[in-house]
């Protein structure tokens, strides 16, 4: 059994884990082995997980369980707290009123429960679909319909930006444009889309 923990960068698997999974070493280590994937993100991880699954499939390494720990607070609150954490290095209550950033200590402490679930099936030597169902039931994976919808759209847009910026002689200018786009998307477009989604869902 392999426990594969990875980071998500801009809705995709990080460059280090992607580079590893595309290496000959990964093929040697993972071939034919069951894999448990583990990620800790702000709130969007599904598209990255799909890409991880595709790369593991090429190594004949089936995913038998996935644990995706996230910041459970409101999207825009988590933006503020994560930025505070990143730029100060302090994982405290921003301004004394906001919650702590990232995955909660409670969720991290409870992660051992998922390990016990995996261990039971590992000792038997058979991994069944019930394992993932148990993890979901215990909160090891949460899917929010609105965030999933937003993530799919953002993933496509990030791909467009990446193709525009990579190798461009106007790289610095385009990066500034991307920076401005992120602010626009997070603080203006997302609330509008969320309101429209809230009004129409589940119509």
Language-model regions: role of each:
Residues 2-203:
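FMN-binding flavodoxin-like domain, especially the glycine-rich phosphate-binding loop
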């Amino acid at each position: 059994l392999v426990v594969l923990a990875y980071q998500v960068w801009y809705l995709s698997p990080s460059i280090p884990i992607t580079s590893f999974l595309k290496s000959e070493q990964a093929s040697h280590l993972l071939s034919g082995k069951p894999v448990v994937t583990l990620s800790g993100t702000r709130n969007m991880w599904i598209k990255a997980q799909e890409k991880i699954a595709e790369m593991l499939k090429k190594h004949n390494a089936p995913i038998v369980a996935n644990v995706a720990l996230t910041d459970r607070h409101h999207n825009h609150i988590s933006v503020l707290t994560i930025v505070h954490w990143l730029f100060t290095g302090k994982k405290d209550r921003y301004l004394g009123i906001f919650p702590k950033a990232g995955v909660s200590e409670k969720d991290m402490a409870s992660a051992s429960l998922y390990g016990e679930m995996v261990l039971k099936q590992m000792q038997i030597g058979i991994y069944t679909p019930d394992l993932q169902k148990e993890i979901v039931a215990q909160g090891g994976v949460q899917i929010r319909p609105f965030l999933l919808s937003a993530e799919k759209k953002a993933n496509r847009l990030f791909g467009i930006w990446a193709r525009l910026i990579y190798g461009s002689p106007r790289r610095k200018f385009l990066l500034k444009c991307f920076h401005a786009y992120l602010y626009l998307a997070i603080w203006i477009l997302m609330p509008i889309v969320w309101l429209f989604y809230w009004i129409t869902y589940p119509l």
